[in-house]
């Protein structure tokens, strides 16, 4: 049924729950997992690239790598997991990777945003659900 499952991860508890669901589904379907971690860098766009900005980007990329390694630790079977780290808007990157990789299912955690931020920006999960060309499972 599923051949490729995309699992965005940001290290949140909702993302970890989604990872467990994705691993279960991949295990029973024989699917491979593409795990994506997005470094959101819109706050530095347009700023001159000095040492502090460079260091901040390095820290964010290291966190992305750590999140993906934590996901690997949950994999108790032989599910193939491929890591992807990208910079940009999370929803946009998730949708791009889904299209590039011909993803059958996206399994993601519900957004951790609340209040005014969510009202203004909407959640990543909302944007993905409304724009994805494949099935999306949102885990809360």
Report each predicted region and the residues it spans.
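Structural beta-alpha unit
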Residues: 73-106
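Gly/Ser-rich helix-loop-strand patches that form or flank binding pockets
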Residues: 96-140
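Short beta->alpha linker loops
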Residues: 63, 85-89, 111
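Hydrophobic alpha-helical membrane-association signature
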Residues: 18, 64-67, 124
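A short acidic, glycine-rich active-site loop
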Residues: 53-66
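Small/aliphatic-rich secondary-structure junction motif
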Residues: 3-52
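Short loop/turn motifs at secondary-structure junctions
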Residues: 1, 29-32, 79-80, 102
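Intrinsically disordered or low-complexity boundary/linker segments at protein termini
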Residues: 1-17, 77, 82, 131-140
């Amino acid at each position: 049924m599923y051949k490729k499952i995309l699992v965005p991860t940001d290290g949140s508890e909702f993302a970890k729950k989604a990872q467990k669901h994705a691993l279960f589904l991949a295990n029973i379907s024989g699917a491979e997992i593409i795990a994506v971690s997005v470094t959101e860098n819109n706050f530095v766009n347009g700023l001159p690239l000095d040492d502090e900005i460079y260091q901040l980007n390095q820290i964010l990329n290291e966190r992305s790598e750590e999140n993906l390694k934590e996901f690997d630790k949950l994999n108790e079977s032989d599910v193939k997991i491929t890591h992807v780290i990208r910079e940009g808007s999370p929803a946009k990157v998730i949708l791009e990777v889904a299209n590039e990789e011909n993803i059958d299912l996206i399994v993601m955690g519900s957004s951790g945003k609340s209040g005014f931020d969510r009202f203004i920006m909407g959640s990543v999960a909302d944007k993905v659900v409304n724009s994805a060309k494949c099935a999306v499972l949102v885990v809360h």
